[in-house]
Amino acid sequence: MYGGDEFSNNGDFYDDYAHTGDPQLDLEYERSYYTSRMPDNVKYFLMNFCQAIKDGNLYDIQNMYENTFPQISDHHFDKTAWPEEQEVASIVDNEKVFLILYKELYFRHIHARIPGGPKLDQRINSFFNYCDFFNLIISAQNPVMLELPDIWLWELVDEFVYQFQNFAQYRARLTDKSQDEIQQLCVNHSNVWSILCILNVLHSLVDISNIKKQLEVISQGVDPQTVAGDFGKLSFYKMLGYFSLVGLLRVHSLLGDYYQAIKVLEPIEIHKKSAYSHIPACQISTSYYVGFAYMMMRRYADAIRTFSDILLYVQRTKQLYSTRSYQNDQINKQAEQMYHLLAICLVLHPQCIDESIQQVLREKNYHDAMFKMQCGDLDVFKSFFIFACPRFVSPCPPAADAPMEDYVKDPMEHQLLVFMDEVRQQKDLPTTRSYLKLYTTLPLAKLASFIDPNASEDDVSKLLIRLLCFKHKMRNLVWSKGPSGLEGSFKSGSELDFYIDDDMIHIADTKVSHRYGDFFVRKILKFNDLNRKLKGVNI
């Protein structure tokens, strides 16, 4: 009746002709067809995952999200995608909310694991899936009764911003795209992953949760439930609002708007531990972007404090990040980036830091690079910055008629230009500082001869400009208290200060001695704690 070739292609013939016209029978057929292709443990996992989300069982959801899903991904889908939506829909009774959440994980897995990254249609579909999720929870008249673990909410917001960043870089690379793809990007889907959409979603989550008001009253010792509203009372909305503030910090940093990046965090007291900072990846990411923004605003003292505090935290909790996972890899990479940024800041603005951080800088040979930077090696500054900075993006995509070039590096090169311009202004200051540290009084002419043995009177007047530059660059705005990270007072951060009377420089060493007592107290307490644990061990 049928030719033999009609039965080829692994039985796809039956998929074309086995429909009866009865919706119920067709649904049962599709369910049996897809589930027969799916490994049993994957099928049971999806069914149990869906049921746990429907029941709001946070313990089971978190266990399956953090443990089972990565394990199955490693075993069955290491370099391939998870089953598509229609395959999963047939075994979870088309549960709408679960399918949206499943697709979020599905597209996240493709971004992280599939060689070559996602295709254009997958990037677009991922965007529309996020739109479905956010429309579901933001546009509802009443709060959506959905319970998800905080770690998932953080990674959802973090991934949302990451995919925006990734898409912005993808669309800026015109050299590897056909005319049809450029048409799709610039005309048919010009609003997909647009900066306005991203900012609108994040601000909407902040507003609907009333998270800013809640943080303000918490700092005043008032119960946040009094201002939370119907949506903000729920942990689901409250945590999404908080994580969206961090998402906005990241977005503005990627765009190079450092003032707005710090401004958006104003309800959060950046330098104080918060009840909302229990997700390590969120806390570390916040400190990375805050510290980087401070550095680019030339607030080196605040940047050093931010990096030092979080790197001490990473040191104390490093056992948590030893297992291999996407978030742990990201945490370890950001920690390494922050050591590079800290080294830059310490060269530009020397000051005392915790001894354990100094020890890490010594062990990882940062001191060699720091010495080169102090000697004015601009290439080391450049390489450290390129390694440690965020991957900047442009808010505006290339025009449809733009030359077929690679525009990905343009935002990075602009930020590098701004940074290196500041470094060039300061590259001679370490030399000046090294001479001043040797004296309590020093004639201007003598200092000029140290710097240039053939110095003339014109060089002495130029030296005054250099000394004024030293004073200016060593004077920073430093945060002291208050909810706004932009507030502060001007302080001199140099280890020495000086004034000029006629042609004589009067120098005062203001270096603060190392507080070794704190270091030894911490080590003694740690040793006592270890001793107590050893005594409690039964042999």
From Swiss-Prot:
It comes from Drosophila willistoni (Fruit fly). Keywords: Cytoplasm, Initiation factor, Protein biosynthesis. Belongs to the eIF-3 subunit L family. Its main location: cytoplasm. Residues 306-514 form the PCI domain. One of its GO terms (cellular component) is eukaryotic translation initiation factor 3 complex. Coiled coil: none annotated. Component of the eukaryotic translation initiation factor 3 (eIF-3) complex. The eIF-3 complex interacts with pix. This is Eukaryotic translation initiation factor 3 subunit L. Component of the eukaryotic translation initiation factor 3 (eIF-3) complex, which is involved in protein synthesis of a specialized repertoire of mRNAs and, together with other initiation factors, stimulates binding of mRNA and methionyl-tRNAi to the 40S ribosome. The eIF-3 complex specifically targets and initiates translation of a subset of mRNAs involved in cell proliferation. One of its GO terms (molecular function) is translation initiation factor activity.
